[in-house]
UniProtKB/Swiss-Prot annotation:
Domain notes: The C-terminus contains repetitive amino-acids that may function as a cell-penetrating peptide.
Inducing factors: Expressed in the late phase of the viral replicative cycle.
Family that this chain belongs to: Belongs to the asfivirus CD2 homolog protein family.
InterPro entries: Ig-like_dom_sf, Ig-like_fold
Record's subunit section: Both glycosylated and nonglycosylated forms interact (via C-terminus) with the host AP-1 complex.
Native source organism of the sequence: African swine fever virus (isolate Warthog/Namibia/Wart80/1980) (ASFV)
Disulfide bonding pattern of the chain: C122-C190, C129-C173
UniProt signal peptide: 1-16
Region of interest: Disordered: 243-278, 341-362
Name listed for the protein in its UniProt record: CD2 homolog
Biological role: May play an immunosuppressive role by inhibiting lymphocyte proliferation and subsequently facilitating viral replication and generalization of infection. Responsible for viral hemadsorption, which may help viral spread. Increases virus replication in the tick vector at the step of virus uptake or replication in the tick gut. May play a role in the host Golgi reorganization to yield viral factories. May play a role in host cell penetration.
Regions of this protein lying in the Cytoplasmic compartment: 230-381
């Protein structure tokens, strides 16, 4: 502090000092004036600088006048003490002026810190550590228990090197001030950042996907119904046109049918089965539509184009010369005849055996002596 004051005295520079204090704390603004000096002024800024006290130092004693002793006190080295009953001291600038030198003191409210917030972005390899509460803070970022970054600001950004760190590592954000300290630890998992980004996008837009599915299903259902209705209407129209264009039955058949229906009634015999009459669409009063001749003149059909003259036949190709006949093959020599087989000797003739004699019955007379009458047969039943 003495070195700073000597520097200010030599170069006539205004020094600014920040004080961080809590509620109901006594604040002492050190002047560190050791030499005898006259014309020491303590001022405070309220839109303009107003004088608190006018002092002078002699024989190591600082004597001041014209100041409110219920709010302030001035020590022997001309330091200003502010009592805690003054609630307007925060965010206020006090000024010490002596020997054409100036020192500005700014008093700020010191608040305790709470746990910070850690966020990360895998695609950018970025970790952000941000404070939640607290003043006059110090932020530290530890990766795998190693301090990698430090700042006095309210947030800290750090880009890690993916070649030095794995896809999964531990990040700790530490925040502290003169009152207390807090930290937050988080596991950084960037094994598949593309898949994770797709998952986040899907979770954020799941309601839009639901509405798209409903719209697609409704469109397909309506298209199917329209196709079915169109198919049925075309089929009915085609059937109606076929009935109109079909030729009427011949007159002889109609007369024959009328004759059969009116004049001759065939009564089936008891043994004849009753057969159903063949169905005819003309036995009912079905309206028959005929095409009315058009009143507009018909467009004449164009005459057919004349056939082109036939192309002349090409001249016949000359026949090739006949091939010479091959020389006849010589006949093979005849095979020698086998010697004749000798005839077998004739069989010896045996005389026939005599017939056995059958004796006649003694009571039968000979044929010549029997009376035989011829009976004429007219009918055989």
């Amino acid at each position: 502090m003495i070195i700073k004051l000597i520097f200010l005295i030599c170069f006539k520079i205004v020094l600014s000092i920040n004080y961080w204090v809590r509620y109901n704390d006594t604040v002492t603004l050190n002047s560190n004036i050791n030499s005898e000096t006259e014309g020491i002024f303590w001022n405070f800024y309220n839109n303009t600088f107003n004088t608190i006290a006018t002092c002078g130092k002699k024989n190591n004693v600082c004597e001041c006048s014209n100041y409110d002793k219920s709010l302030y006190n001035i020590t022997n080295n001309c330091s200003l003490t502010i009592f805690p009953n003054n609630t307007k001291i925060f965010n206020t600038t006090y000024q010490l002026v002596y020997s054409r030198n100036r020192i500005n003191y700014t008093i700020n409210l010191l608040l305790p810190v709470t746990s910070p917030i850690i966020t990360y972005n895998c695609t950018q390899s970025l970790i952000t550590c941000e404070k939640t509460n607290g003043t006059n803070i110090h932020l530290f970022l530890n990766l795998n228990d190693t301090i990698n970054e430090y700042t006095n600001k309210s947030f800290l950004n750090y880009y890690w090197n993916s070649s030095e760190l794995n896809n999964i590592f531990l990040a700790t954000c530490i925040i502290n001030n003169t009152l207390n300290s807090a930290n937050t630890t988080k596991v950084i998992n960037c094994t598949n950042p593309l898949l994770k980004s797709y998952q986040n996008y899907f979770l954020e837009n799941i309601h839009t996907l639901f509405y798209m599915i409903i719209f697609i299903v409704s469109g397909i259902t309506i298209s199917i119904f329209i196709s079915i209705i169109t198919f049925l209407s075309l089929r009915k129209r085609k059937k109606h046109v076929e009935e109109i264009e079909s030729p009427p039955p011949e007159s002889n058949e109609e007369e024959q049918c009328q004759h059969d229906d009116t004049t001759s009634i065939h009564e089936p015999s008891p043994r004849e089965p009753l057969l159903p009459k063949p169905y005819s669409r003309y036995q009912y009063n079905t309206p028959i539509y005929y095409m009315r001749p058009s009143t507009q003149p018909l467009n004449p059909f164009p005459l057919p184009k004349p056939c082109p003259p036939p192309k002349p036949c090409p001249p016949p190709k000359p026949c090739p010369p006949p091939k010479p006949c091959p020389p006849p093959k010589p006949c093979p020599p005849p095979k020698p005849c086998p010697p004749p087989k000798p005839c077998p000797p004739p069989e010896s003739y045996s005389p026939p055996k005599p017939l056995p004699s059958i004796p006649l019955l003694p009571n039968i007379p000979p044929l010549s002596t029997q009376n035989i009458s011829l009976i004429h047969v007219d009918r055989i039943i």
